Amino acid sequence: MGQIQLTDLTKRFGDTVAVDDLSLDIDDEEFLVLVGPSGCGKSTTLRMLAGLETPTSGDIYIGGDHMNYRVPQNRDIAMVFQDYALYPHMTVRQNIRFGLEEEEGYTSAERDERVVEVAETLGIADLLDRKPDELSGGQQQRVALGRAIVRDPEVFLMDEPLSNLDAKLRAEMRTELQNLQDQLAVTTVYVTHNQTEAMTMADRIAVMDDGELQQVASPFECYHEPNNLFVAEFIGEPMINLVRGTRSESTFVGEHFSYPLDEDVMESVDDRDDFVLGVRPEDIEVADAAPDDAALDDHDLQMDVTVVEPHGDQNVLHLSHPDQPSADDALQAVTEGMHLVTRGDRVTVTIPPDKIHLFDAETGTAVHNRRHDQEADFTQLEQ
């Protein structure tokens, strides 16, 4: 069984705390992605799990067995790195077979048969007699995966395996890795700084910052129900809009606009007064400018379009308050690609009250997340 349990795991390098009291349970056959900025401790966590680093304190269990003092080859894991680390003088067949050389219980014929089986699974059976310098980057990555898969481990550990590929190949390999993980039914821990990889591949995401675990949840929850400001900012592209302000009775007051808070939000704020209001760019509604401020509803703003970023299927609009082009509470909004807006246009911006997030300005903790009680928020495929 590939269940993993990390308990109070800490790693120090001198006075630097790389991983700080991390506890995490990973289910058998789960695809968990460790994500965070450079230096957050995600790769150090993976290396401790692999046995390449020794924890300063805390415990590691795989399949219920204590692993702290086991060498890597006795942990029933396989690791794939950012660098493919293929032997240039060996063929693809020999590179994959190398992962079996130290494994007991195989005859030579069985090893050869297993190599072919893995190569067919990865779609590289026709490349078995080529050498690495005859392969593309994507093909080399498949060979590196094959060398890990051939041993049939309980756990895959992957440290940014797609970062050397171009955008098109990364997208293809994301799909291949998901299909492969489903097919092999193996527990996978995948490290990346790329939140797109995390969102598209993970069963659950573990978000780290400064050596600490910030949130462990499904991609949906991390995006729509972030625990704190860090998760809200790190997950999502374009980034969430964040506006600092204070509460005056039932109104959020920012530097350049005020926003009435409805009863549902007010139930969450307690006696706090300083907040950060958040709204995702795609949740902002953009329409033609109202004739005057009197025509605006309570949750409407008049704003100017300062930049338009066309993406084909959508446009990313940069919006500023009139006469305040560099204000800190400028916003970004996402509109449909056929919604034609040009730089300099004045528009009416609506921030729906059921789509806002509210964070404690001092601690960064989420006080209120957007609601999901409307059927329009969800589309479910018929079974």
From Swiss-Prot:
Chain ranges of the ABC transporter domain: 4-235
Superkingdom field: Archaea
Stated family: Belongs to the ABC transporter superfamily. Carbohydrate uptake transporter-1 (CUT1) (TC 3.A.1.1) family.
Gene Ontology molecular function: ABC-type D-xylose transporter activity; ABC-type L-arabinose transporter activity; ATP binding; ATP hydrolysis activity
Keyword annotations: ATP-binding, Cell membrane, Membrane, Nucleotide-binding, Plasmid, Sugar transport, Translocase, Transport
Entry EC number(s): 7.5.2.13
Localisation: Cell membrane
Membrane topology reported for the UniProt record: Peripheral membrane protein
Record protein name field: Xylose/arabinose import ATP-binding protein XacJ
Any Pfam family the entry gives: ABC_tran
Gene: xacJ
